[in-house]
Amino acid sequence: MPREFADPYVYPGTDVLRNKPGIRDAALLRAFEYEQTADRAAELVNKPITGKFDLDHLKAIHKHLFQDVYEWAGEIRTVNLRKDVVPFAQPAFIESSSRSLAADLAKENHLKGLDKPRFVERLAHHFTEFNMVHPFREGNGRATREFFGQLARNAGFELDQTRIDNAKDQWNHASARGRAGDLEPIKAILAEVIRPAKAVSFDFDKPDDALRKHPELRSAFLTLKAAEAYAASIPVEARKSFIDQTRARVRETLDEGKDMPMPSVRERDAGRDR
């Protein structure tokens, strides 16, 4: 078969995917794609695409992310794909394979109610299984990560996509090891980039907003308030270090998926406004 007919998704005689703006340079297309999908992903932070965490849900996410780049955004590929020597699902089996994987995910209640170690373990498994299907001609990793980022949020966790983007080579290596049956590298990365939602809220939201979202954070803020009050009684040069250490201890506890114990009466008294 002539090369120009081997892949209908690329411009004849090139490896550049056909795209809406008509870019013919691969590097420029990568930059354009990254910029456009980053903007579209930002829209999903406050307005996520709802769905049943199945293929239709994944297709809707892919369409949203890549709508400015490819005409076929959100559509199942019609050509075979492989990465290195590992083939992905053939087009004829993408629908059935995805139904089976979505059913497996639903049987586990979409990973709700798990502590962080177990959540990381099961997410690594399901991500790798979905990634092996690779339903789209391009953009599978980004769409699948957004898909599981929404699933994580639904289960009470946050997946920090920016940290994955900033270590793309490491992530790609871990994904390749996962396709070969070794999930340890991807579990190690997920353990670093996944945090309980309440821990993220404690770090970045105003206290009133954080408490509205997660009332169980009351003990964490009381602990911090007590530490700040106590710090007023120690030498100035030691205050910041003491408060930072307390905040780090609270953050570590929350990152483990646990709640801070309520401060003692004495500690709470120290934290009252003077």
Regions found by a protein language model. Name each.
Residues 1-274:
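FIC/Doc superfamily catalytic core
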